[in-house]
Every structure is written in C-alpha cells, then in structure tokens.
C-alpha cells in the first residue's frame, strides 16, 4: 500500500512520518481534522506524540485532502482493537508468527487451518502490512492457550520463520 502513496511524500519526510502513523493507527482525515473513530484529535497532541512540529499536522492533512487518491484512502480509515495484550488476562492464547518473507501467500491460511483442526476458535487475526512495518508479524488470538504439540506443526507452515506463544 505504501508503495502507491510514498511518492507523494518524497519531498516531505515529516509529512511521510505523519501519514504512515495515520495508516498504522487507522486515523481518519475529515473536514481538515484527524479522527480516531468519531473522536477528533488535536494537532498539538498528535505532533507531540510523533515528535514533529505542530504545523506539520495541518500541512499533511491539507496535502492529503488535496490529492484525490490519498483522500479516498485516508478518509475511510478505521482504528482496530488489538487483543494480543489483553489475551492473557482473558485466559486466551496468542500465536505470533515471524515470517521468512511476509509477501509469501498462505501463511495465515496455513496457521488458521492447524488451529481449526485442533478445535480452537480464533478470536482475532491481525497481520502487519509489510510495506508499513519494519518487522511485520501475524498475530492470532485463540480462545484458550495453545497446546504445545501444535508449535512444530505451525513452524512447518510454508513461510513461517519463527513462532512465539504467549
């Protein structure tokens, strides 16, 4: 995805950083403002969190809204609740997959198939976009702790480099 949009930000490294974080967190642009769901976020707090000048935030928003291709995407982003850190509190299991090459198709399908054959329900599966994340991962939250016997089977899935269970 970033390959399509990165070219618009080549001359503006701070705007690139801001746009990447908007994508990463699912923050939407609407009416010259940035939203997390229906909650409008302040430019100054976003700037502080991203360690950029406050003026770079509205400049990035204006740039995105002026470009039809960018605006079509950034106006439709939605934040997502990631359950991996909550899972242990709920007595759920988490499978973290480190891929050999994140562009290899079928990693999620292969792991999900093993989980399903073990009669475990998947609560959530989140895959980091390999164009946005330096070290993309696949996280699968399952209804209970994963039996250790499944780890070698998951490691054997094509494209899996390593498996972390917690």
Which residues does each predicted region cover?
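Residues in the recognition helix of alpha-helical DNA-binding motifs
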Residues: 60
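Helix-turn-helix DNA-binding elements, focusing on the entry/boundary residues of the two helices
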Residues: 43
């Amino acid at each position: 995805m970033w390959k399509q949009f990165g070219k618009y930000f080549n001359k503006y490294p701070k705007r690139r950083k801001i746009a990447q974080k908007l994508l990463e967190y699912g923050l939407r642009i609407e009416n010259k403002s940035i939203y997390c769901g229906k909650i409008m976020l302040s430019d100054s707090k976003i700037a502080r969190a991203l360690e950029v000048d406050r003026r770079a935030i509205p400049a990035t928003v204006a740039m995105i809204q002026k470009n039809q291709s960018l605006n079509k995407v950034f106006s439709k982003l939605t934040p997502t609740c990631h359950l991996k850190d909550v899972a242990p509190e709920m007595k759920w299991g988490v499978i973290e997959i480190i891929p050999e090459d994140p562009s290899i198709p079928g990693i999620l399908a292969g792991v999900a198939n093993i989980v399903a054959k073990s009669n475990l329900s998947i609560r959530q599966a989140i895959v980091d976009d390999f164009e946005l994340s330096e070290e993309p991962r696949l996280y699968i939250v399952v209804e209970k702790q994963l039996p250790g016997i499944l780890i070698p089977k998951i490691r054997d899935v094509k494209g899996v480099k390593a498996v972390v269970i917690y």
